Design a protein with these regions (language model features):
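Structural signal for membrane-spanning alpha-helices in multi-pass inner-membrane proteins
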Residues: 17, 59, 90, 111-115
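Membrane-helix boundary connector in multi-pass membrane proteins
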Residues: 80-100
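Membrane-water interface at the C-terminal end of transmembrane alpha helices
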Residues: 105-120
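Core segments of alpha-helical transmembrane spans in multipass integral membrane proteins
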Residues: 8, 12-21, 36-64, 77-83
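Non-cytosolic membrane-interface motifs at loop->transmembrane helix junctions
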Residues: 30-40, 68-71, 95-104
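N-terminal membrane topogenic signal
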Residues: 1-7, 116
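Membrane-interfacial loop-to-transmembrane alpha-helix junctions, especially the N-terminal start
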Residues: 3, 69-78
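Juxtamembrane "helix-exit" motif on the non-cytosolic side of transmembrane helices
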Residues: 23-29, 63, 88-95
Length: 120
């Protein structure tokens, strides 16, 4: 069930990243950056949308394979590490949010628990 929840979280995160243009007023804010940095911000957001959406669909569609194979365990552990690093980064960089930090910590656990639970 946590694997399905993780897939759902990834899809929600894809949609969240898709909203960055309006949520963070990028039409006005990005021109303040150099063209290169503006492009990097937008390409990173698009990349995360594609990655999160794809992984979310894979986790939901192939939950048994994710739960019962070494590759699946590696993917779960990789995402747990990703979200752990992202949680730590939330409090290092300006504009941190306790609420987002808690959400990211929950994401870490959603992927870490099934990655570390022994199968019988």
């Amino acid at each position: 069930k946590l694997i399905i929840a993780g897939g759902g979280l990834l899809i929600i995160l894809a949609l969240f990243h898709l909203s960055f243009w309006s949520l963070f007023n990028w039409q006005e804010e990005l021109p303040k950056l150099s063209a290169e940095n503006s492009g990097i911000m937008q390409m990173s957001a698009i990349g995360f949308v594609c990655l999160f959406l794809s992984l979310g669909m894979i986790f939901i569609s192939f939950r048994k394979e994710i739960a019962n194979t070494k590759l699946g365990q590696a993917l779960l552990f990789t995402l747990a590490i990703f979200f752990l690093i992202r949680t730590i980064a939330e409090f290092i960089f300006p504009g941190s949010s306790i609420e987002l930090g808690v959400f990211l910590a929950i994401c870490t656990l959603v992927f870490l628990i099934p990655a570390t639970v022994k199968k019988i």
